[in-house]
Amino acid sequence: MAAATLLRATPRFSGLCASPTPFLQGRLRPLKAPASPFLCRGLAVEAKKTYVRDKPHVNVGTIGHVDHGKTTLTAAITKILAEGGGAKFKKYEEIDNAPEERARGITINAAHVEYSTAARHYAHTDCPGHADYVKNMITGTAPLDGCILVVAANDGPMPQTREHLLLAKQIGVEHVVVYVNKADAVQDSEMVELVELEIRELLTEFGYKGEETPVIVGSALCALEQRDPELGVKSVQKLLDAVDTYIPVPTRDLDKPFLLPVESVYSIPGRGTVVTGTLERGILKKGDECELLGHNKNIRTVVTGIEMFHKSLERAEAGDNLGALVRGLKREDLRRGLVMVKPGSIQPHQKVEAQVYILSKEEGGRHKPFVSHFMPVMFSLTWDMACRVILPPGKELAMPGEDLKLSLILRQPMILEKGQRFTLRDGNKTIGTGLVTDVPAMTEEDKNIKWS
């Protein structure tokens, strides 16, 4: 299990699975979903405000089981901070703003809000919670510097609570703060204590410091409706204090060439095409030349504008959730999963050597071993791609719970480099987590692999 421990303890590759970004959230026309003309109104002009970098910037997000109150808590945070000028109040309906979310009553696409405490500036992602949307969970959690795990006091930990914690740990989220929500719906204080105990045991099981993790009990709905201050407003204030103190400000990699995994592509009438994502490393400046690589594309363009939370920037730094206006490209030229990089700084690869931990049955992985040429889907940065797994010479079976060195050949070349983390999934199961150790050239035998 040494390699498994290494994989789980290694600081994450900063580029794994970037999440949706807040660039003009809810007003643009995304690549695959039409927006009404009304939503795009007023975007033909430059942003009037300039983003001021006067506090440390930290990316956090809510995770947890469906209907445990993640979006309600996010709304409550903005309401409380808005009273002191640290946020713009976002109603539940505004956060839960995609048509499919409203229609089905569950959060499908991750939404973003911005707020500031006295100590920090936060970009907050409201992550999806339904089992069918774990794919979004994978691509929506990795850039987070920490998570707020929401657990309903009247339910306790549920299946997606476990799965979200497992995925968060696999993709490198090392710090979690817990909010036990809906405490107003539970009359028995002993039940709340049991839920807290169960959560701490679960955190420890997944490699977190369960005994040290802050656990705050409250009710996000009470905070929103300004009822029962102890369970409502004060509990959310305690949560924000815990996030400020327990989740550290990460060290940003500003010295390397910039790398921006593309999360979404939008078209703004009168201005052009915007790509959004989290800048994983380096500094991106207005006027920079860039390449967009992956999915058999190699597109060169120039960044003509940068914005974050409706505010313009002359330069963006690693960790920023941003939108970049690109010159001379149409929306249909681009897609999610491409990576914007400094020209010549990195190339796509189709084959990697990697140290991979295969999840056991108890961890939610496969029940049975697999053989060479097994074809799972690899998730890294914002892309996912089918791949063939090649076992080491003399190895016939890869067993659940095993850690081993594997070769993986992708269906198409994608951005991969040494130290990059990835997740392997088969159907609706996460089956493995890995770390790239080398990027060798393709052999003739590799090129002849069949994909049908």
Swiss-Prot record:
- UniProt-annotated stretches for the region G2: 105-109
Looking at the record, the residues that make up the tr-type G domain are 55-251
Q: Where does the record place the region G5?
A: 219-221
Q: What biological process terms from GO does the record include?
A: translational elongation
Q: Where is this region: G1?
A: 64-71
Q: Where does GTP bind?
A: 67, 69-72, 181, 184, 219-221
In short, the EC number is: 3.6.5.3
Q: What is the first-listed, main subcellular location in coarse terms?
A: mitochondrion
Which Pfam families does the entry mention? GTP_EFTU, GTP_EFTU_D2, GTP_EFTU_D3
Presence of the UniProt keyword Plastid in the record: no
Q: Where in the cell is it found?
A: Mitochondrion
Q: Where is the region G4?
A: 181-184
Superkingdom classification of source: Eukaryota
Which parts of the sequence carry Phosphothreonine?
278
Q: Which SUPFAM superfamilies does the entry mention?
A: EF-Tu/eEF-1alpha/eIF2-gamma C-terminal domain, P-loop containing nucleoside triphosphate hydrolases, Translation proteins
Instruction: Provide the positions where the record notes the PTM Phosphoserine.
Output: 312
Q: Where is the transit peptide?
A: 1-43
One cellular component term from this protein's GO annotations in UniProt? mitochondrial inner membrane
Post-translational modification N6-succinyllysine, affected residues: 88, 234, 286
Q: One MF term from GO for this chain?
A: magnesium ion binding
Q: List, alphabetically, the NCBIfam families matched.
A: EF-Tu, PRK00049.1, PRK12735.1, PRK12736.1
> Which proteins does it associate with, and in what oligomeric form?
Interacts with NLRX1. Interacts with ATG16L1.
Job description of the protein: GTP hydrolase that promotes the GTP-dependent binding of aminoacyl-tRNA to the A-site of ribosomes during protein biosynthesis. Also plays a role in the regulation of autophagy and innate immunity. Recruits ATG5-ATG12 and NLRX1 at mitochondria and serves as a checkpoint of the RIGI-MAVS pathway. In turn, inhibits RLR-mediated type I interferon while promoting autophagy.
Q: Per its record, how is this protein called by name?
A: Elongation factor Tu, mitochondrial
Look up and give the organism this protein is from. Answer: Mus musculus
